[in-house]
């Protein structure tokens, strides 16, 4: 099995008082995640925490690395987190609307599997080319796919932050599952929109291509987002394949 190295960090940014993002890395269980809370300060932060804890619980104590098992565990983690968020809202009605976006990347014996919901993203840098693997679950993405707006209009669109999928939104989480082969020298990026709203893809690609250490790349991406305005919490997780 190829070796992997992980690095990650979350930053409150320059405009927010609290951080509703979360990330977690488990080298032993071969997974990493990023989440971005929605629904207000304390509630959003708690939703991201619930997703993190639910994933840790789901992956702990199982050594089966088959693709089938990893896919099952990802689905289970999303369902458990969704159930726990909805249960919390039932018990705490003032937190109605609480939820989070979620990215979960796990490596199996055959390659990688991604669970995705919301507008956080997972990218892969392969052979110097950066590819966005996930599709945003947003109003503007729907409009773009329907040919009703052009990509250059997204950043200025008044409804650009409207998401139609997140954990805690419906009884059954509508996640996307993606899988593929993991090749030597692949570099996976999981991030919240605090990065991608501030830093264009070509600049992200150039930082990921650079020869600096993986931990320094995380720092560089976050600092670049802050230099561009740092309007939101910023979370960056990298997984390098060797």
Task: Describe every region a protein language model picked out.
Residues 1-242:
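PP2C/PPM-type serine/threonine phosphatase catalytic domain
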């Amino acid at each position: 099995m190829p070796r992997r190295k992980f690095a990650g960090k979350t930053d409150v940014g320059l405009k927010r008082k609290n951080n509703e993002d979360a990330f977690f890395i488990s080298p032993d269980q071969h997974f990493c995640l990023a989440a971005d809370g929605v629904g207000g300060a304390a509630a959003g932060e708690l939703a991201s925490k619930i997703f993190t804890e639910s994933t840790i619980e789901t992956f702990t104590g199982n050594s089966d690395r088959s693709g089938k098992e990893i896919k099952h565990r990802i689905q289970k983690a999303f369902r458990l987190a969704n159930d726990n968020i909805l249960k919390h809202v039932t018990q705490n009605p003032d937190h109605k609307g609480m939820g989070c976006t979620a990215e979960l990347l796990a490596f199996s014996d055959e390659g990688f599997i991604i669970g995705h919901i919301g507008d956080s993203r997972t990218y892969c840098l392969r052979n110097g080319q950066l590819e966005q693997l996930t599709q945003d679950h947003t109003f503007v993405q729907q409009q773009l796919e329907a040919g009703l707006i052009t990509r250059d209009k997204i950043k200025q669109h008044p409804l650009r932050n409207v998401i139609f999928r997140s954990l805690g939104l419906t009884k059954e989480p509508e996640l996307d599952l993606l899988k593929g082969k993991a090749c030597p020298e692949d570099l996976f990026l999981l991030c919240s929109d605090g990065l991608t709203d501030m830093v264009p893809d070509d600049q992200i690609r150039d930082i990921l291509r650079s020869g600096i250490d993986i931990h320094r790349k995380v720092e560089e991406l976050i600092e670049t987002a802050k230099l561009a305005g740092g309007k939101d919490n910023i979370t960056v997780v990298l997984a390098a394949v060797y």
